[in-house]
Every structure is written in C-alpha cells, then in structure tokens.
C-alpha cells in the first residue's frame, strides 16, 4: 500500500478497509472499476453512493495543497458505475489561479479515461461556485447528482439555479461529448504524437485553441492534460494543470519530470504558452517544448 493511504484507510470501516487494502498497490491512481465497486459494496453492505462517501478519505489522500493545507477529495461516477477519484492541487508559492479543484481533478480523470457522461459527483465539501460552473459544462450537467456527507442528494440544478452554460453560447456538444479535431503534425516522436492525439480530443468551442500538454518522467511514463474550456471562461481547466494533477494522482513527484510538451492549434484565438510556462517553471527545471500545428 502507498504511504499516502496508511493513515486514511484507518478512517474506513474495518470490513471495507480489509477488502480495499489489496487494491491500493503501487499502481493505484484513484480508479475503481464497476466490478470493484460492486465487490466493495457487497462486503461493506453499502450502496454505491454510501460507498463513495465512505471512500472520500482515500480520495482526499491524493491531494497536494501546500497553500491551504485543506484536503478535498471527490469521486466522479461514470455512466457504467466506475469511480474516478480526484483531489485538489495547489502550486507552492504560485498564484491561486493555478490551483486544481477536487471536482475538476475527478472529472478530468474520468475524461482522460474515456468517459462520455458522469452521473454523480461525491465530494467531502460543498462544491464552490467555480466547480459548480465547471460541472455545468458537462453532458447533462444540470442533472448530475451531488452527494455530500450529512446532506440530502440533490442535482446540480439545486446548487446552480438559473445557470449560464454552453447552450447560451450556442454550443450543442458540451464537455465529455464524443468529438475530435483533426490536427496535422509530421513526427515520429512518441511524446509529440501523444500530444497531438490529446489536443485533437480537447474541448475549446469558445477560442478554438485546441491544445494538450504531455509530461514525460525519468522512467519514461507520460501524463497528459487536455484543454477544457468553460462558457464562463475563468473556470476553464488548462492542460498543464490537468497533466500535473494526473501526475500527482499517480504518486509521482514534480522532480521526476524530464520533458514537457505543449501542442496547440494555429487557429486558436488565444495561446496557452504563457500560462503553461508559468505553471511548469513553478514545479520543474525543464524547458517547455511548444508546437503550433494546423488543423486539417
């Protein structure tokens, strides 16, 4: 079991902790498939949402909050019943806008794993306005059920009434919809090809700045982030922050980063290079490789 879970697992009921323990090996990064969820429900005599609430201490253990020291854990439930954990991330000494909220982390975890719809968000603290707006960008966002400890379950529409969302800006394919933008790059560099693939899957209906970041660590592993825009603009999630969140979920250190690539479309109304460099240079002594490519 990873060290970060040692104290947290003691907060769980014993039967649940005993069943979960073998799942928390070195490769665990916060994902439980639907079969594992059913297995844990059976052992703990909980339904899936009760289980999610019980597992929030494990999700919170994924957090890295050096500024607030406030650990937030969240679980996004995919349409097939998979659990995707996420947690808040803050960059030491840097402006707070670089932060990743737990709900964003969990949702990006699900998106990077191929989910196209989220039915529920389970979180240990009431979603802030930023996160409510971020969730409202998702497929059927207003219907997502929010679960909080000690409170009745309610849809996002309860937490964000009279919402402004993608439809108000004539966007008909919201975040998590299956969509792809074809971008052109001639290269045999696997990291650049990976960045190209993820940029094509990014969500940028407002600026057309389809973009992705890929981080490579010393052992050759790669961690990706896609740009995820928001109708309210400010709650958009930058690809570097998404990639850093993925790296931390996988229990890696920023010092492990040896390469960092930002690939973005030449047709974007904006560029993410400045913000991406700021975040990267806050955590690693690595130069950003910046590629601008044309759409088909």
Swiss-Prot record:
Active site annotation, chain numbering: 103
Keywords (A to Z) from UniProt: Hydrolase, Metal-binding, Zinc
Enzyme Commission number(s) from the entry: 3.5.4.5
Keyword DNA-binding: no
Assigned GO CC terms: cytosol
InterPro entries documented for this protein: APOBEC/CMP_deaminase_Zn-bd (IPR016192), CMP_dCMP_dom (IPR002125), Cyd/dCyd_deaminase_Zn-bd (IPR013171), Cyt/Deoxycyt_deaminase (IPR050202), Cytidine_deaminase-like (IPR016193), Cytidine_deaminase_bacteria (IPR020797)
Enzyme class label: hydrolase
Domain CMP/dCMP-type deaminase: 47-167, 186-296
Residues annotated as binding Zn(2+): 101, 128, 131
Cofactor binding comment, as recorded: Binds 1 zinc ion.
Cofactor requirements of the protein: Zn(2+)
Role of this protein: This enzyme scavenges exogenous and endogenous cytidine and 2'-deoxycytidine for UMP synthesis.
Family stated for the protein in its record: Belongs to the cytidine and deoxycytidylate deaminase family.
Subunit structure: Homodimer.
Name of this protein: Cytidine deaminase
Species the sequence originates in: Shewanella amazonensis (strain ATCC BAA-1098 / SB2B)
Native organism taxonomy: Bacteria, Pseudomonadati, Pseudomonadota, Gammaproteobacteria, Alteromonadales
Gene: cdd
